[in-house]
Amino acid sequence: MDMGNQHPSISRLQEIQREVKSIEQQVVGFSGLSDDKNYKRLERILTKQLFEIDSVDTEGKGDIQQARKRAAQDTERLLKELEQNANHPHRIEIKNIFQEAQALVKEKTVPFYSGSNCVTSEFEEAIQDIILRLTHVKTGGKISLRKARYHTLTKICAVQEIIEDCVRKQPSLPLSEDVHPSVAKINSVMCEVNKARGTLIALLMGVDSSETCRHLSCVLSGLMADLDALDVCGRTEIRNYRREVVEDINKLLKYLDLEEEADNTHAFDLGQNHSIIKIENVLKRMREMKNELLQAQSPPELYLRSKTELQGLIGQLDEVSLEKNPCIREARRRAVIEVQTLITYLDLKEALEKRKLFPCEETPPHKAVWNVLGNLSEIQGEVLSFGGNRTDKNYIRLEELLTKQLLTLDAVDPLGEEKCKAARKQAVKLAQNILSYLDMKSDEWEY
């Protein structure tokens, strides 16, 4: 239809659809809960558009009625997705774990408010356990769940960094106040810094509604000014003491700056952690090798060289410092599985090539197991290349293919032959490992 002659009702429906389309990505990526301001804003916009669509006069014309129906369906689909994102069982699981962390923080930060810098091992271990549980929440590759898990993890990891710093680096002093008049003031400031540390942790976890980032930042800047004004000339030990307290203040200010930017940036970016960077460098090299190996038709001369380098990558991952951080532990675990899966793929390819070159007499059951192993090798190559989520047709197809191979193995009767029994057991384990790897791939890890 010529745009100049288009019916006004059709034009209005198209305009509404453009408005709905403009917020679609916000809905798809919505990672909050149904009581969030942003949820209510998106819900209000979409509901308003539904009313607007409903008010369009179709004049009884079939084409306008169809256009109105399509526009309403698109809008209702987004409303439904918004509701599902906010109420997804795994989103609720993330919320419940975060609430546990909030309760823990409320209980364990009390000593900070008296000026103490004491962090119990119980608090430290409980935070680590919460982070570990969050890393195991399945997202199925769903954007909203990945964002929710990431945002929650970064908050709690920031708290963990703060309390780890307390454990790792207590100020080497305080000095006795008899040493110098400035020491009493530094001791007083250090007490205030410890109180601010507790307040910051409470702020990060959303359990202190009486404080704001801006006010706490002003308090810390004031303490910094007090320290700068002290005369500590010629007293190295006092100057060092002051420097340690200044460093503590700067660290807390850094967290405050990140928290204020949190809505617009990747605050507390785990990707900047030096251990994560090492893991990512290993994965980058592994992916380069994987692409080369999967593209090659039949490169047996490449297998040995590649396996040697891949074993070296496993060694590099073994050397990564975990820093008592479950996020790093999970990232390393997944990286080891990635590299080990590629090694297993090469081992199977080698075994299949060797069987072709040096055929030997096999019983029918043993031959059936080898046929399944050949199928598994082909499927594993596809799984290694997979990059989607569980709702993808390719995921479902690969899962069905692997299940079929397991059923085929289950039907093989070894007829009491030990060698065939062992081969079947190994093939079953391989198929299960590939299924597990496919599941992991559908839930890509984010930093």
UniProtKB/Swiss-Prot annotation:
- List GO terms (cellular component aspect): cytoplasm; cytosol; inclusion body; junctional membrane complex; membrane; mitochondrion; nucleus; perinuclear region of cytoplasm
MF terms (GO), sorted A to Z: adenyl-nucleotide exchange factor activity; protein kinase binding; protein-folding chaperone binding; ubiquitin ligase inhibitor activity; ubiquitin protein ligase binding
Q: Does the keyword Transit peptide apply?
A: no
Where does the BAG domain start and stop, copy by copy?
9-86, 95-167, 182-260, 275-350, 365-442
Pfam families, A to Z: BAG (PF02179)
Tissue distribution of the protein: Detected in brain, lung, stomach, liver, kidney and testis.
InterPro entries xrefs? BAG_chaperone_regulator, BAG_dom_sf, BAG_domain
Give the record's keywords alphabetically.
Answer: Chaperone, Repeat
Q: Name the GO terms of the biological process aspect.
A: Golgi organization; negative regulation of neuron projection development; negative regulation of oxidative stress-induced intrinsic apoptotic signaling pathway; negative regulation of proteasomal ubiquitin-dependent protein catabolic process; negative regulation of protein refolding; negative regulation of protein ubiquitination; protein stabilization; regulation of inclusion body assembly
Subunit-level organization: Binds to the ATPase domain of HSP/HSP70 chaperones. Binds PRKN. Interacts with HSPA8 and JPH2.
Function noted in UniProt: Co-chaperone for HSP/HSP70 proteins. It functions as a nucleotide-exchange factor promoting the release of ADP from HSP70, thereby activating HSP70-mediated protein refolding. Has an essential role in maintaining proteostasis at junctional membrane complexes (JMC), where it may function as a scaffold between the HSPA8 chaperone and JMC proteins enabling correct, HSPA8-dependent JMC protein folding. Inhibits both auto-ubiquitination of PRKN and ubiquitination of target proteins by PRKN.
Q: Please state what the protein is called.
A: BAG family molecular chaperone regulator 5
Output the lineage of the source organism: Eukaryota, Metazoa, Chordata, Craniata, Vertebrata
